[in-house]
């Protein structure tokens, strides 16, 4: 979203139709992902950063796992410090336990990251091989999206010297 000559950034406020939307940059799914805090409703519009069902793909190479984890922590901070209770996702139903949802997402990412690290240690060296091993219980139709996230996880593990 562009207003005027510049894009939206942290701390910007958009007023539209009687609503006040605080801009919350949430890169990770993609580099330019944004969420919008609705303080009057104790809610946050999350777009693709947090979904109403399932979990979000980190769309490598544009999306980066480190950024995504930081964005989830930023959303957790909104639940703890600013009283956000409701997630209004871009896909799926409204979620009423914002803090619980964000904590689930953080735990899920930590679990998947550990699985990917173990898969590499066990000899699965390519993103495709890691997907086949780690996502064996997931519908094959979702594997292309899973591979994007695996590529982001492998990059993260390499950057942190873990593989």
Can you say where each PLM-predicted feature lies in the sequence?
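Short N-terminal micro-motifs specific to bacterial/archaeal maturation
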Residues: 4-5, 17, 58-59, 107, ...
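Secondary-structure boundary/capping positions in well-ordered alpha/beta enzyme cores
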Residues: 11, 41, 82, 123, ...
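C-terminal regulatory/interaction regions
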Residues: 118-163
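Intrinsic structural disorder
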Residues: 1, 84, 162-163
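Acidic/polar short surface loop at catalytic or gating sites that assists cofactor/ion binding
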Residues: 1-5, 136
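Metallo-beta-lactamase
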Residues: 6, 13, 20-113
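Generic low-polarity alpha-helical segments
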Residues: 7-8, 163
């Amino acid at each position: 979203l562009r207003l005027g000559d510049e894009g939206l950034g942290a701390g910007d406020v958009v007023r539209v139709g009687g609503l006040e939307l605080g801009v919350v940059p949430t890169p990770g799914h993609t580099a330019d992902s944004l969420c919008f805090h609705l303080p009057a409703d104790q809610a946050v519009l999350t777009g693709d950063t947090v979904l109403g069902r399932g979990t979000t793909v980190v769309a490598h190479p544009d999306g980066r796992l480190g950024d995504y984890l930081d964005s989830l922590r930023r959303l957790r901070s909104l639940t703890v410090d600013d009283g956000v209770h409701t997630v209004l996702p871009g896909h799926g139903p409204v979620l009423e336990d914002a803090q619980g949802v964000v904590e689930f997402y953080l735990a899920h990412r930590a679990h998947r990251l550990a699985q990917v690290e173990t898969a590499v240690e066990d000899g699965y060296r390519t993103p495709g091989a890691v997907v086949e091993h780690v996502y064996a219980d997931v519908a094959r139709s979702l594997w292309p999206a899973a591979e994007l996230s695996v590529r982001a996880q492998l990059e993260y593990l390499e950057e942190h010297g873990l593989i």
